[in-house]
Amino acid sequence: MEIISQYGSWLVWITAVFGFFMAFGIGANDVSNSMGTSVGSGTITAKQAIIIALIFESAGAYLAGGEVTQTIKSGVIEPIQFVDTPDILALGMLSTLFASGAWLFIATKMGWPVSGTHTIIGAIIGFACITIGPSSVDWSKIGSIVGSWFVTPVIAGILAYAIFASTQKLIFDTEQPLKNAQKYGPYYMGITVFVLCIVTMKKGLKHVGLNLSNSETLIISLAISLIGMFFFHFYFKSKIFTQSANKGTFGAVEKVFSILMLLTACAMAFAHGSNDVANAIGPLSAVVSIVNEGGKIVSGGALTWWILPLGALGIAVGLITMGQKVMATVGSGITDLTPSRGFAAQFATAMTVVVASGTGLPISTTQTLVGAILGIGFARGIAALNLTVIRNIISSWIVTLPAGAFFAIIIFYVLRTIFN
């Protein structure tokens, strides 16, 4: 309590800086890898990807604002355990932010796509273990997270393999690929819109009071997907499409999948912004709340007005200044991508997110996407995969939790020494 009463304003300022650093890391790594397939496949340029990501990530982040004050969303520890030592929780959140930002910065410099959520969970584990003991951590939750490293990439890889194989059989390996793309394209579009609507309503819009039942979500998604399917049925048959496409070439076919891929990338960026923004501003909100309440730990309350813009700014700066490093790894480092291959990977990721949301399986979008890209590579043969890059990526996943914990412990001791 003494630290909060004496240094409350300093804690808020320092946490704001650390929160910006964490948001910077999310923008440079998490957001960048989600747009990597679109850039690597040639669907859009890196500059266009940055603009699209900023628009949809920011939109998702602002819609998430009302729920972010639930701070430690991971469920790894319960804040109530710090009710008698709020100053320890405040320093712990400071440590968590800096540690997570530091690991994301290092991973980005190395070109490793890692999970921001897993990074911050590792950091929370680190400071919790040295302050209130290992028993305070919900280790079953950690077991589920570790299990997801294997389960979700495999699911996404299998789905991506199946989607890619279907496009080859129905479209690319036929005598008239463009005609078949016009024939089957609307069906791919309808299925894509159906899944993306579910992702948006269940993941992206759950923070704005849109409490739809599963049946309502399915009905609305089906209706929108049917509208989309009919629209693109006429679009692919129209002169606008046929004149812009170069008939008889695979480039014209790939244009169909470019549209699908762009839709998927926008929807996933929106869902990511509405959920993962809490990784940066959740701990920041916790410290501000503790200071404003004079040391009391509250579970709800209004979000201070400047926190969301700070998080959005940090994500934007990180994406613009360092985003292309991870984009390159995801977009071209693992395997060569075309719009059809990139769509298969992005769509498989979206489908896996839907499955995980329905089953409660903890999921990293980063790891899911990488698993989907691996599935595409396997469909083309093992020689199509860059095994060195894959080895480095998997190693970085394994290191992420302990790295977050290690940095958090170091920073916590430094901060405690300074403020004591």
UniProtKB/Swiss-Prot annotation:
Q: Give any single GO term for biological process.
A: phosphate ion transmembrane transport
Source domain of life is Bacteria
Report the protein name in the record.
Putative phosphate permease HI_1604
Annotated GO molecular function terms are: phosphate transmembrane transporter activity
Record key words, sorted: Cell inner membrane, Cell membrane, Membrane, Phosphate transport, Transmembrane, Transmembrane helix, Transport
Q: Which family does it belong to?
A: Belongs to the inorganic phosphate transporter (PiT) (TC 2.A.20) family.
- Summary of the function given for this chain in its UniProt record: Potential transporter for phosphate.
